[in-house]
């Protein structure tokens, strides 16, 4: 016979960004708890609103499965003394398992007998295990927590109710000074406290109190309501996935509605209006059928449709205040002079240990000079890049960006166009922030891409130089994201810029404001980001590519992909083993690896030397790998007929030199002795 378990925790309003991860965590930890306690179940469903986290287990076994465990103890010769009596070692072993020496049996393993005991544990009824759900709730982790009411404990928010039901049976459990039962809270304004009748009636009991506990159902309600408004008004409404997820975690009973604002505000840049609505007010944007922004918005109230006209007016009033600010800053910022703002950046601190934003821009400008040549920018592109680098942070001192910091770069583009700068300069100012997340949009223009790389590289090198290096999960200055951005942009544009050579060039630069330090740490940090970009590539293949001598990001990613592609083919293992043997022996070479043909003693030696001399890796990675694997028979013949470590030192070094030249060329692809072929 199976049962159904419900656990609900009622809390003060949770931050929207915490709700979904906490709901998921609760489900995962409940599943782990049941598995650990040998309780089978059919399904787990989680629930969440801003004021509750809940989980329901259906088809739950009514008792634990019985447990039979075998334990291996000491060898028989240690377990028995000369008289055949059990020693203290044997007695202590069984006592630790809660058994006696009568339970001992001997089993033979590889010719020797050992003590074994079998422990059997009869499963308990599920009712005896349910109180352990309190520990599940205690084990939840949150990004922030708080104390309340003078208590010593802390949690994400104050706890008000705990509901634990096994079918209709309630459990009177204690959690953070709250006594459990079957009482839950309805909607803050429309509902009231209610008794949950059973684990299976949970959603319906709360629905009567204007709470939709299932977030998927709430989401669908919001989408359906928006689609209805869309059809009735003949408009297009952008349902942004991130905004939708946030809104559904702000409401327990959603009702969507349309509001409006004065069309005069449409003269303000669209990005300002969209930011005001989406980022600040959590409104959905409304457009006409051609995609043109309309003076309307969609909001979702936490409640029903009663007195909705008052709610609409209130939301419109709040938005207008935001739009007034945007209109004011748009008008006033156009009176500012870009060069004046750039000069004022001398007084804006980039970081107290590093210097001003203006100094950061100057260093970035010098880096762009190096990158422009390596990226093959045209003369016109180089001119635009220099101009963009000279002014690209100016918009940080505009009123608009001061009020709406999400618009940095975006407003820079608009203000530079108004000031008569070229579209390429304006676009680069917007694009230099890209990507803004791990999978974020990348720059489209070469000028913007180079400026983005240069800005990020100076940021990384500057922070590393003053010892502000990320450790563990701690990365307050988002240096991992910046490095990932550099790597992604280089790969996307296919620029064959060797990162080790580039970093060497940057460390050779001289600045009045800062001296770059900690180069080795920077290189390791960049390699770690390339490693991350390789995704699920096997660890040994990653290590082989990263240990190679080619640090062109696009080449490294292509090499890793090519190795994975052929790793299941028949010739992969023998080819890699041949190259690995060459790599391992080449490490013994001394001095400059020059080959003297006069010292050859067999045809196989000569054949390998000639093959290595004519080897030029070219084309895509898959083709280069075929070139290297084609050497496998020649390498094998060399090893079968040649004593590499000959007694004659000159002969030995000559043979090591052949292998050294081979591995030097192969290392441009990967260090094959890092690949596991077992």
UniProtKB/Swiss-Prot annotation:
It catalyses: tRNA(Gly) + glycine + ATP = glycyl-tRNA(Gly) + AMP + diphosphate. Pfam families: DALR_1 (PF05746), tRNA_synt_2f (PF02092). It comes from the Bacteria. GO terms for biological process: arginyl-tRNA aminoacylation; glycyl-tRNA aminoacylation. Its EC number is 6.1.1.14. It is an enzyme of class 6 (ligase). GO terms for molecular function: arginine-tRNA ligase activity; ATP binding; glycine-tRNA ligase activity. Its main location: cytoplasm. SUPFAM superfamilies: HD-domain/PDEase-like. It is found in: Cytoplasm. Keywords: Aminoacyl-tRNA synthetase, ATP-binding, Cytoplasm, Ligase, Nucleotide-binding, Protein biosynthesis. GO terms for cellular component: cytosol. Belongs to the class-II aminoacyl-tRNA synthetase family. Tetramer of two alpha and two beta subunits. PANTHER family: GLYCINE--TRNA LIGASE, CHLOROPLASTIC_MITOCHONDRIAL 2, GLYCYL-TRNA SYNTHETASE. This is Glycine--tRNA ligase beta subunit. It comes from Streptococcus pneumoniae (strain CGSP14). The gene is glyS.
């Amino acid at each position: 016979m199976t049962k159904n378990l419900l656990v609900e925790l009622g809390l003060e309003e949770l931050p929207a960004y915490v709700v979904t991860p906490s709901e998921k965590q609760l489900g995962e930890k409940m599943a782990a708890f049941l598995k650990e306690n040998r309780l089978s179940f059919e399904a787990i469903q989680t629930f969440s609103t801003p004021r509750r986290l809940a989980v329901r287990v259906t088809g739950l076994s009514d008792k634990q499965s019985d447990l039979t465990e075998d334990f291996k103890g000491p060898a028989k010769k240690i377990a028995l003394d000369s008289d055949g009596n059990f020693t203290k070692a044997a007695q202590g072993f069984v006592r630790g398992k809660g058994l006696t020496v009568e339970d001992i049996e001997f089993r033979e393993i590889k010719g020797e007998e050992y003590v074994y005991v079998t422990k059997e544990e009869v499963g308990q009824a599920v009712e005896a295990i349910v109180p352990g759900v309190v520990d599940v709730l205690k084990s939840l982790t949150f990004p922030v927590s708080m104390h309340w009411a003078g208590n010593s404990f802390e949690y994400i928010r104050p706890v008000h109710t705990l509901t634990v039901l096994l079918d209709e049976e309630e459990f009177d459990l204690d959690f953070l000074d709250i006594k459990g039962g079957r009482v839950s809270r309805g909607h803050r304004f429309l509902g009231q406290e209610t008794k949950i009748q059973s684990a299976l009636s949970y959603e319906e009991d709360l629905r009567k109190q204007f709470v939709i506990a299932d977030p998927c159902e709430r989401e669908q309600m919001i989408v359906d309501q928006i689609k209805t408004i869309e059809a009735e008004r003949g408009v297009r409404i952008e349902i942004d996935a991130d905004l939708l997820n946030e809104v559904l975690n702000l409401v327990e009973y959603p009702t969507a509605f349309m509001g409006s604002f004065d069309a005069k505000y449409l003269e303000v840049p669209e990005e300002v209006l969209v930011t005001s609505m989406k980022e600040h007010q959590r409104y959905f944007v409304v457009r006409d059928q051609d995609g043109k922004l309309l003076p309307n918005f969609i909001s979702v109230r936490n409640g029903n449709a009663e007195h909705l006209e008052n709610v609409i007016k209130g939301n419109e009033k709040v938005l207008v205040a935001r739009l007034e600010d945007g209109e004011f800053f748009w008008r006033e910022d156009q009176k500012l002079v870009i060069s004046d703002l750039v000069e004022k950046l001398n007084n804006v601190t980039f970081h107290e240990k590093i210097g001003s934003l203006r100094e950061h821009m100057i260093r970035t400008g010098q880096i762009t000079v190096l990158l422009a040549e390596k990226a093959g920018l045209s003369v016109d592109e180089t001119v635009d890049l220099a101009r963009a680098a000279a002014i690209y942070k100016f918009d940080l001192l505009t009123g608009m960006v001061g009020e709406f910091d999400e618009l940095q770069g975006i407003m820079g583009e608009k203000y530079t166009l108004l000031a008569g700068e070229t579209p390429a300069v304006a676009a680069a100012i917007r694009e230099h922030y890209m990507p803004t997340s791990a999978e974020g949009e990348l720059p489209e223009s070469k000028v913007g891409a180079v400026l983005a790389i240069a800005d990020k590289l100076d940021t990384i090198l500057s922070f590393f130089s003053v010892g502000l290096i990320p450790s563990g999960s701690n990365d307050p200055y988002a240096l991992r994201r910046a490095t990932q951005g550099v790597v992604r942009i280089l790969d996307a544009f296919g620029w064959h810029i060797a990162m080790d050579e580039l970093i060497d060039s940057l460390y050779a630069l001289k600045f009045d404001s800062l001296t770059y330090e900690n180069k080795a740490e920077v290189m390791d940090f960049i390699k770690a980001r390339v490693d991350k970009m390789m995704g699920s590539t096997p660890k040994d293949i990653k290590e082989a590519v990263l240990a190679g001598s080619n640090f062109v990001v696009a080449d490294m990613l292509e090499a890793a992909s090519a190795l994975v592609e052929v790793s299941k083919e028949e010739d992969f293992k023998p080819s890699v083993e041949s190259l690995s043997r060459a790599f391992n022996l080449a490490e013994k070479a001394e001095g400059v690896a020059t080959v003297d043909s006069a010292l050859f003693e067999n045809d196989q030696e000569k054949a390998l030397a000639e093959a290595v001399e004519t080897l030029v890796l070219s084309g895509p990675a898959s083709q280069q790998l075929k070139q290297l694997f084609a050497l496998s028979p020649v390498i094998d013949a060399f090893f079968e007929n040649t004593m590499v470590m000959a007694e004659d030192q000159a002969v030995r070094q000559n043979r090591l030199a052949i292998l050294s030249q081979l591995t030097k060329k192969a290392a441009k692809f990967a260090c094959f002795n890092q690949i596991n072929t077992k």
